[in-house]
Amino acid sequence: MIQKPNLSFWKLWNLSFGFFGVQIAYALQSANISRIFATLGADPHNLSYFWILPPLMGILVQPIVGTLSDKTWCRFGRRIPFLFVGATVAVLVMCLLPNAGSFGMAVSTAMVFGLISLMFLDTSINMAMQPFKMLVGDMVNEKQKSLAYSIQSFLCNSGSLVGYVFPFLFTFLGIANEAPKGVIPDSVIYSFYVGAAILILCVIYTTLKVKEWNPEEYAQYNEADPEANEKSADWITLLKKAPTMFWKVGLVQLFCWAAFMYMWTYTNGTIAETVWHTTDVASSGYQEAGNWVGVLFFWQAIGSVLWAMALPKFKNEKFAYALSLVIGGIGFAIVPFIGDKTLLVLPFLLIGCAWAAMLAMPFAFVTNALEGYSHKGAYLGLFNGTICVPQIMAAMCGGYLLHLVGSHQSNMMIVAGVLLVCGAVAVAAIRNPKRA
């Protein structure tokens, strides 16, 4: 096998640039889904059930995209066609979802419309997101993978900065942040429109700038039979042959993604309770809290961007991973005890450290362990299960846990903190990868 060539910084940048737009869409979804469905009339104890759809679509779509793209060799590339189709569908659905309450439908009908829109949005975002991870695995050598995934993490978090702050920014510019009962405010609707436009522009940029290898070049650099990926291999067989690192990192992922599922689900209700002292979803205070969630997630992304730049400086990647999760766990744990909206920025900066590590480090560990394996795209799609399954489990248990902690959404932040610390403990089973 010939060593993969070192790529210039800008080639590494171009591989992941479209992730910036995809992450804007993902940020708008993660910051506003609880707000949207609560505004439509969902009960807080049932709110987590709406969050089952995003990871469920991920666990179904991403392995399929990985498997199909392993077998795809066309004039437009191997991974790029899936990226472009997913982004196009996402743009269309982003124009529909925030209007779920604007078509004069009954509450139940609006909920169903919102759920169907959310299902298609999740499907398309996952379809657009997975190719970026596979492009790095395909074209970047071991020595540069940490840098490549750190760039991806930087772009991902930069996209989050933009997506999270949109509703707050539009409200500041005079766009209405209140609406009749059951209707989503214009500040949220316009945010989705602008996010959709940026998404398609970013994906077009990556499509034009990235030239994937042909089958012969891929085989030359990846020590894999170009026909091997075309042979059928069921997922059970692949999982049985998966490297040990796949499962060890997966255990860490279990705790981490469950923690962040509770953050996305309950942050709006938490700060509405602790800062604005309201649980009325039709009140101006609740909608202000919804905007401030975006601001806090903005600062979380700032923390992630800064920490992502620091992560490559650590010589011991295992230590960096565990440290990041502990810092994030502390951030979660102190959220319920802060009643000032400005001071809440601090714990979300800390939470951003964990997020940066979660985006960059698991895939660096796993893609290094997959060197020489056929069906690499399928493996990365299956590894996405370590992101999706924990979220599904957390969403299914969310209402029950909320009852256990006194029906105060703020207490779910403490639960999230404990989960991250458990994830840090699980890092002990991981070995640091060998660098070329």
Regions found by a protein language model. Give the residues of each.
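Intracellular loop-helix junctions on the cytosolic face of multi-pass helical membrane proteins
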Residues: 1-9, 101, 105-117, 127-128, ...
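Helix-loop boundary and gating motifs at the non-cytosolic
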Residues: 2-57, 248, 252, 256-280
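C-terminal ends and interior cores of transmembrane alpha-helices
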Residues: 83-108, 327-339
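C-terminal transmembrane helical hairpin of 12-TM major facilitator-type secondary transporters
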Residues: 318-362
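Loop-to-transmembrane helix entry/capping segments in MFS-fold secondary transporters
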Residues: 44-45, 142-154, 373-383
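A late C-terminal transmembrane helix in Major Facilitator Superfamily
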Residues: 373-405
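Loop-to-transmembrane helix entry
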Residues: 43-53, 186, 277-301, 411
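Intracellular juxtamembrane helix-capping segments at the cytosolic ends
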Residues: 127-140, 357-372
